[in-house]
Amino acid sequence: MVMYGENVPVHKKFVQYGMLKTELDEYLEEELGRAGYGGMRLQRVPNATKIIAYVERPAIAIGRRGRNIRRVEEEVQERFPLLGRVSIEVKELPSPELNPRVVARRLASALERGIHFRRAAYGALRRIMNAGAKGAMIILSGKLIGARARTEKFMEGAVKYCGEPGDEYMIEGYVQAVTKPGAIGVTVRIMPPDVELPDELEIRPPEEVEDELKELIGKSEDEAEGA
């Protein structure tokens, strides 16, 4: 996606592009949060930038006769001129229970309605695992009960905390719930069903391995003869 002048250093282009994506994502979160916004993707098309927004309820995001999404397109074009002409395509999230942002927003809404934090967290955790996740962790930080702030963690399945595995295999969402006692930070981390962990071994039948070895040996012999 070419959006910057030719004289701008490459590393600065990457930084600026990252900042633009973050700001755009935050803006769409504000505008499409009620529709269950779960993230976006940028695509460069001829003479324009296409934004694919993934939401839980597309009808709410689009609005009556497309008015809401047209308004968002106009505001994005005005606020982010580097994107050029903007078109937004709204797509439905295939599995909202596996999107940490959607889950965090639902959990925050439950806390704001006065549902006990343990009941709300365990309910969210159960729905995540029932959707097929390999693992999940929910962290609630703030005034959960009483005047003193505290942190509670809820986990199930395989969870990677930090380092490269944590960054590569876990996806994260964060939302802040505003309750009467005070603000509560809601962090949801999910390991998707399709993640292949490095410590997971596949034991294959001997006959299958033997067939592959024979095929490789045959190819090696053919190459040797050809040389």
Curated annotation (Swiss-Prot):
Gene name as annotated: rps3
Organism listed in the record: Methanopyrus kandleri (strain AV19 / DSM 6324 / JCM 9639 / NBRC 100938)
Subunit structure: Part of the 30S ribosomal subunit.
NCBIfam families named among the record's database cross-references: PRK04191.1 (NF003219), uS3_euk_arch (TIGR01008)
Protein role: Binds the lower part of the 30S subunit head.
InterPro entries, alphabetized: KH_dom-like_a/b, KH_dom_type_2, KH_sf_prok-type, Ribosomal_S3_C_sf, Ribosomal_uS3_arc, Ribosomal_uS3_C, Ribosomal_uS3_euk/arc
Lineage: superkingdom: Archaea
Protein name: Small ribosomal subunit protein uS3
GO cellular-component term (any): cytosolic small ribosomal subunit
KH type-2 domain mapped to chain residues: 24-94
